[in-house]
Amino acid sequence: MNIAIRNPVPVRREEGSLQVGLDPNDRIETAKVFAVYGKGGIGKSTTSSNLSVAFSKLGKRVLQIGCDPKHDSTFTLTKRLAPTVIDALEAVNFHSEELRAEDFVVEGYNGVKCVEAGGPPAGTGCGGYVVGQTVKLLKEHHLLEDTDVVVFDVLGDVVCGGFASPLQHADRALIVTANDFDSIFAMNRIVAAIHTKSKNYGVRLGGVIANRSAKTDEIDRFNAAVGLRRLAHFPDLDVVRRSRLKKSTLFEMEPTPELKAVTDEYMQLAETLWAGADPCEAVPMKDRDLFEFLGFD
């Protein structure tokens, strides 16, 4: 079968926006699927990669899919920038039947399988369509049949129909946020996007992961107001910065008491998600209401 990267056909209208439709044959039915969202630069790739390792240490077979054209989601797992699905397809002139799994799947730390979807050239095409074709390619190669957990690491806080496409595959959406105005403002917009998607797909909000924050008071106040819950809290430690520079996950860094507390938190998060976190029925605030709600400390 040939996979051609072309502009998607808008097949569904939801609240006035055109969305990229999901072929029922492309649903991921053999694994628990999590989509990780959050403000750009908040640490989604760090969170996703360490969460993937935690799942693997529970004995689960894990696949992490990076959905950013920068293709830097998985480098702490693989120790290199993995080739993207788009790169692999271009190399065979988009004749996907000529690809082998090793052309676009890299095994990382502790057996976590890593895929970087990549994206079309800047200013062209639809990144969400690329994500859909990545899932289709994985199914063609039967790579999802031996997978227990799929983690989508999604570009920034983009919630257009295209980059919301991982929500079509996900069971639970997780939002990474810091304890500040900009991160929570972005989180509210993501909640709105997930609220919209949940009307037509099975995705539900799983909860919030507090990251790079000494405190969580503003996060917790917002969660209580809209119907979210905090699943985990990761403080802003220098070991996180150093792990990125060493191209390593936190589980590979020199152990210290504070680092053990963080890796234990990741293990607890993985256990909670695997056990089946109840969905959050959150209702987003209007932008102006949120503006008045936050801050003033």
Curated annotation (Swiss-Prot):
The keyword Transferase does not apply. This is Light-independent protochlorophyllide reductase iron-sulfur ATP-binding protein. Homodimer. Protochlorophyllide reductase is composed of three subunits; BchL, BchN and BchB. Keywords: 4Fe-4S, ATP-binding, Bacteriochlorophyll biosynthesis, Chlorophyll biosynthesis, Iron, Iron-sulfur, Magnesium, Metal-binding, Nucleotide-binding, Oxidoreductase, Photosynthesis. Component of the dark-operative protochlorophyllide reductase (DPOR) that uses Mg-ATP and reduced ferredoxin to reduce ring D of protochlorophyllide (Pchlide) to form chlorophyllide a (Chlide). This reaction is light-independent. The L component serves as a unique electron donor to the NB-component of the complex, and binds Mg-ATP. The keyword Oxidoreductase applies. It holds the Pfam family Fer4_NifH.
